[in-house]
Amino acid sequence: MNIDDKLEGMLLKYSPVGLQHPSRGLGPSRVDGRGRRGSLDMTLGERSLANHPLLAEDDDDEDEEEDDDDDLAGEGLTSHDLISQDDLMVHEETVKNDGQDEAAFSHRISNKLHYTLSMPVNIKQEMKVPDSLILNKKEKKPGRDPSDCHKKKKRKQRSPAKILTINEDGSLGHQNPKSHICEHCNAAFRTNYHLQRHVFIHTGEKPFQCNQCDMRFIQKYLLQRHEKIHTGEKPFRCDECGMKFIQKYHMERHKRTHSGEKPYQCDYCHQFFSRTDRVLKHRRMCHENKDRKVQKTAVKDSPLRTPENLGFSFPAKDCTLPKKKRQKTSDKSRASITNPAVDKVVEADMDEKTEDRLAKSECLPLYAVATKVKDEYVVTDYSVELPDSPPGSRHLAGEESNDEIISPPKLVLKKIASRRGFKQQALEQSQSLSPLSSFEESKVTRYTFEIVDNKGLLDVETNPDMESVEALQVGQAKPTGSSTNYDDAMQFVKKRRYLQAATANTSRDYALNVSSIVSQSSVTQASVATVIDETVPATILSETQTLNVEIKSSNEKNVLPDEVLQTLLDHYSNKANGQAEISFSVADTEVTSSISINSSDESSPAEALVTSSQAPPTEKASLLQEYSKFLQQALERTSQNDTYLNNQSLTFVNDSASLAGQPLFSTEKQFTSPPRFRPTMNSPLRSTLEKPNFNLLVDTQHSFSFSGDETNPSSVSPTEDFLDQVTSPKKTDPQSISQTFQITTFDQNFRSQFPSSRSGISPQFSIASGQVTLRGHGGADFPEFSLVNETRTQLTSSPDATSSQTFG
């Protein structure tokens, strides 16, 4: 049968499909037959037949059949893929003679129609179908990938394998591929062995146990693989590096480290990995945890879609999601919209159109993968708006009004910036202000363990002289009490050691000046202080201490021995009267610090803070050793009596140039401190004690010398001596401004109260050109007391020349 005979037979059937050429009309016309019957040549008679309701139903049935065929064959594939071999052979012949047969074919059709049906020839008309029907058909059949179409086609052509089994009665029967179904999870398996192995997962049974350990396994091969661990057998060896492995998979995975192969790719960001576990970890950490955030934002972003921005309203994350997850997110977003029914239908149609567009374009990225991944991490993780983000990830213009509703977590970066600004401010303050004002109050209390009772001391600047004095006089207004608790003394030792550790660990040079008022115990008394105020008793003010600490960074750790400190603490904590009549300043924790023997007035802590005397680095060890010896001898000198000397006075040397022009103290006022003595003691000092001369170099220019100088004229009274000591430094050495203050000189008001008390010899520190000399009053200083003259005659003998030593 030739082509003409087939054509005549089809034309006699009056079928609309029969008008098509069998060899090449099946393809394009059938695709168009779902919608429009595109370029089909029809006569007027056929148009009337097509409008007949019965024939129209037939057309709908044929359209549904064609839709089913397209579902099986796939969208975009022409129907000639399903034509039989005979038709394909005819198609090949007609394709060769395509140019020749086309004109003749149309001529034959017109002639046949003219003679058989007696109808006009060559009248073309397109059958128009409403757009709503076309849209409904498109909604019924969403777009699919070509790869999915090929898979479905192969699945249709391949018939399921039939398994021939022998029943119990001996008859043969066919069995389905997966007839063994699990009772727990309804999973189907091909054999009973696989089913039983799967059931072990639910029951927890592990029948295979290792002989060398207690581990059990579900399968036997797992046990055999585990036994290789005990035997040390590693049959698989790498060819490049020689490493051996128990499993072949491990060896292949190891070889990828040599070759650099990364066969596994992330579905989200298209990043490649060499191992599957790393892909899973990357997907779990970077993407799957963020799907929830994307879904939440999609719910809020979906009402903002408009027909103008449908192509760009999707976030950057949606385009990178797989198709199934993308459909789920779109379904959830559509379900969460609360709008009228009409709006729902319109928006659903627009969503489906955009899904078709995305399915055809496969969500091609609009920007590079690297920048996409970077922006995606920042946006989804911290919700930070990037100014240079690509168009796909930018928010819409309509979303700007919804910023108040959407409140994602934001990244706070103020902590690091504040630290940097804090450091810069600290540096600027240290450059512009004095060392005292450059340290904040928090830093000072950190090193002083919150022993600062007067906060006004930390805010003093050194440039105004009298203003600082007045501020400190106001601050020191409350009376303080004394206690002899030994725990306070031990607490002082602990604080000292902490200061040593804090300064030893730091490598940068800094000077931390701490001035505090320790008002609880006389054990930690560093200096006796007074305020020029007649209303405040001297007994109260003598219990107020000023701790002057100046810490210099030093790599050496030469400090005072613990034995010396312990003896000091034991001595002062066990005193009966609770008042420390003598105070040696052990406040300096480093050798580089000055040995500050401090008896300054309470109204001049600025002097104590600014004063700094440094010892030469080469003489640190010897200086510390001799000073400790001096302290031990002083303790031996005072250990026989509870109270040391009645006229004990420590002088404070101030080298500050800021106080040169104006003295801080009025020399017309004198304050007395009534001492308490036991009359049973013969002498507070041992007569056989040597009087060594300790010359301690504290600064490169000045030195403190302690000598037993007894050349004080007897005609000078204590009052005149005090006035001379106050005014003498300005007369002798105008360049080194030094001021001397005594606080416990006897006054006429208190001399009558102690007529029978034994008064000792008071070693005093006098200043001459920057040196402090230790001397005692002569016998005529206190003519009222005869015992003083007796003790002075014992000690005014000529000193031994060998006992005077100088350390420098």
Swiss-Prot record:
One of its GO terms (molecular function) is DNA-binding transcription factor activity. PANTHER family: EARLY GROWTH RESPONSE 4-RELATED, KRUEPPEL-LIKE TRANSCRIPTION FACTOR. Residues 150-159 have a biased composition (Basic residues). It is found in: Nucleus. It comes from Danio rerio (Zebrafish). Keywords: DNA-binding, Metal-binding, Nucleus, Repeat, Repressor, Transcription, Transcription regulation, Zinc, Zinc-finger. SUPFAM superfamilies: beta-beta-alpha zinc fingers. One of its GO terms (cellular component) is nucleus. Pfam families: zf-C2H2 (PF00096). SMART domains: ZnF_C2H2. Residues 56-73 have a biased composition (Acidic residues). Knock-down of the znf148 mRNA disrupts both primitive and definitive hematopoiesis, but does not affect primary blood vessel formation. Most embryos die before four days after fertilization. Belongs to the krueppel C2H2-type zinc-finger protein family. GO terms for biological process: hemopoiesis; regulation of transcription by RNA polymerase II. Residues 15-86, 131-162, 305-338, 596-617, 705-736 are annotated as: Disordered. Transmembrane segments: none annotated. This is Zinc finger protein 148. Involved in transcriptional regulation. Represses the transcription of a number of genes. Required for primitive and definitive hematopoiesis during embryonic development.
